[in-house]
Curated annotation (Swiss-Prot):
It comes from Mesomycoplasma hyopneumoniae (strain J / ATCC 25934 / NCTC 10110) (Mycoplasma hyopneumoniae). One of its GO terms (cellular component) is cytosolic large ribosomal subunit. GO terms for molecular function: rRNA binding; structural constituent of ribosome. GO terms for biological process: translation. InterPro entries: Ribosomal_uL15, Ribosomal_uL15/eL18, Ribosomal_uL15/eL18_sf, Ribosomal_uL15_bac-type, Ribosomal_uL15_CS. The gene is rplO. This is Large ribosomal subunit protein uL15. Binds to the 23S rRNA. It comes from the Bacteria. Residues 16-28 have a biased composition (Basic residues). Keywords: Ribonucleoprotein, Ribosomal protein, RNA-binding, rRNA-binding.
Length: 147
C-alpha cells in the first residue's frame, strides 16, 4: 500500500483527547472535577473588589473630589520667554512659540503670564493672558491679540 494524502493518519497514541472535567463519573473526572471539596473556591469566581465579607476598600475609604470636565487647560509661558527669544517689533504666534520650543505641544491652548521683564515692542497672539502681562506689553507699545 502506497502513502497517499487520503491514507495519512496519526500514529496510534500520538494524539490524546482533551479531558472534559465535570461531565459525570464515567468521564473519569466527574462530581468534584479536581477542584477539591465544596466551597467558595470550587465555584466560579468572586466578584471584583470582594474581600471575603470584610468591608471592602471602596466602602472603607471616603468619597473625595471630582473631575471637572469643563476645565480649560492652558500651557503657560512667561514674558521672560519672549524677551530671550524675540527681537524688537516681532510678531509672536502660537506656531512660532512651538517652533522656538517655548510650548511643548503644538495644538494646546496657551496663556501668557507676567513673570520677567520686557524691553521690546512685540505683537503677541495667544489664547489667554494675565492682566499684568497685558500691561507690561502695552507699556512698551506692543499689542496682545486673542486667538
Amino acid at each position: 500500500m502506497s502513502i497517499r494524502l487520503e491514507n495519512l493518519s496519526y500514529t496510534p497514541g500520538a494524539r490524546k483527547e482533551k479531558h472534559r472535567k465535570g461531565r459525570g463519573h464515567a468521564a473519569g473526572k466527574g462530581k468534584q472535577a479536581g477542584r477539591g471539596q465544596s466551597g467558595q473556591k470550587k465555584r466560579s469566581t468572586v466578584r471584583l473588589g470582594f474581600e471575603g465579607g470584610q468591608n471592602p476598600w471602596f466602602r472603607r475609604v471616603p468619597k473625595r473630589g471630582f473631575r471637572n470636565f469643563n476645565k480649560k487647560e492652558y500651557e503657560i509661558f512667561n514674558i521672560s520667554d519672549l524677551e530671550s527669544r524675540y527681537q524688537d517689533g516681532d510678531t509672536v504666534s502660537l506656531e512660532s512659540l512651538y517652533l522656538k520650543k517655548v510650548l511643548k505641544k503644538r495644538n494646546m491652548k496657551a496663556k501668557l503670564l507676567a513673570n520677567g521683564d520686557l524691553t521690546k515692542k512685540l505683537t503677541v497672539t495667544t489664547n489667554a493672558f494675565s492682566i499684568a502681562a497685558q500691561k507690561k506689553i502695552e507699556e512698551k507699545g506692543g499689542k496682545i491679540e486673542v486667538r
